[in-house]
Design a protein with these regions (language model features):
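Zn2+-dependent metallopeptidase catalytic core
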Residues: 45-71
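Conserved catalytic/binding loops enriched for acidic/polar residues
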Residues: 41
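Pan-zinc metallopeptidase signature
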Residues: 2-30, 204-281
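Active-site scaffold of zinc-dependent metalloenzymes
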Residues: 77-169
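Post-HEXXH active-site segment of zinc metalloproteases
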Residues: 142-146, 158-197, 238-246
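Short, solvent-exposed interaction modules
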Residues: 197-205
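Ligand-binding pocket scaffold of soluble enzyme catalytic domains
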Residues: 25-28, 48-49, 131-137
Length: 281
């Protein structure tokens, strides 16, 4: 099987372009909110839709991401992903971009790749990082927008940390054993932080794993940012956030997190944040 996949990878290699070359040759645009982005190849996305999606990021969040550029490309993959050594992939693998969609390349592609562009990356600017998003793998607007905003959320938390007000809200929810979480990372780190009721000292008080708590708060904050941005860009139902790996955070708890994020980072002009409840029949 590995030989077949390896042969497939070799057969399509000639149609791929290095991500760094894409960055050098593609004009990067600056949205009205200050976020940098570009489109390359047959993305299958209307330009107006991409602009609307990117512009959903509030100015106050985009201001922290000046070293990021988001590239919408048909398919992104790691060089050698289909080879026998694919199980030992490292961050040093070359990121390759397909300018078109083919079923063969799609089998090897992944949702996004992060690339350190360095001094020769984008418009001569040093130290900018590129995030290459596979638009043709993320076929619908919901999936593509969510993938973009998840990356925005993680990058923002890396730059700024977690506000005290959000940390307090989320930790109080966790201690109160509110049902579910917003991602597998948040779900697992929350359980580790609280120790499943097993981390108790001699005085019967629960011991908190502080490192896991930090990881949990960061994951919960980046998740909340991503879901908030998604709500500004796409109309969706609460149930669409569900995943098999973990129970989704209870609706009221999620609403409380999103309202706080909206207060911290108000929407840009022409965007509106709202939570609508359905009446039970």
């Amino acid at each position: 099987m590995a030989e077949v996949v390896g042969t497939m990878a070799e057969s399509i290699q000639s149609g791929l372009v290095q991500a760094t070359q894409v960055a050098r040759e593609t004009a990067v645009r600056c949205a009205a909110n200050g976020l940098h982005f570009a489109a390359y190849g047959e993305t299958g996305q209307d330009d107006a839709d991409l602009v609307r999606m990117v512009q959903a990021v509030p100015i106050s969040i985009a201001a922290a991401l000046t070293r990021k550029a988001y590239y919408f490309v048909p398919l992104a993959l790691a060089e050698g992903r289909g080879s026998e050594s694919a199980g030992h992939r490292s961050g040093n693998e070359e990121t390759m971009i397909s300018p078109v969609f083919t079923a063969e390349i799609a089998e090897l592609a992944i949702c996004h790749r992060n690339v350190a562009l360095g001094t020769g990356g984008v418009a001569g600017e040093e130290g900018r990082d590129g995030v290459f998003l596979s638009t043709r793998l993320l076929g619908d607007r919901f999936s593509l927008a969510f993938e973009l905003f998840i990356n925005v959320g993680h990058a923002f938390v890396d730059e700024t940390g977690v506000p005290e007000s959000f940390s307090e809200l989320v930790w109080n929810q966790a201690v109160a054993d509110v049902r579910g979480e917003t991602s597998q990372d948040a779900w697992e780190s929350r359980a580790q932080a609280l120790g499943g009721g097993q981390n108790k000292g001699h005085d019967s008080r629960q011991r908190i794993d502080e490192k896991a708590k930090t990881d949990y708060l960061e994951a919960a904050f980046s998740d909340a940012i991503a879901i908030y941005l998604l709500s500004l860009s796409v109309d969706f139902d609460y149930s669409e956030l569900r995943e098999r790996e973990y129970p989704l955070l209870a609706p009221q708890a999620l609403a409380d997190r999103l309202r706080l994020v909206a207060q911290l980072f108000p929407p840009n002009a022409d965007y509106e944040f709202s939570i609508r409840y359905r009446r039970r029949m």
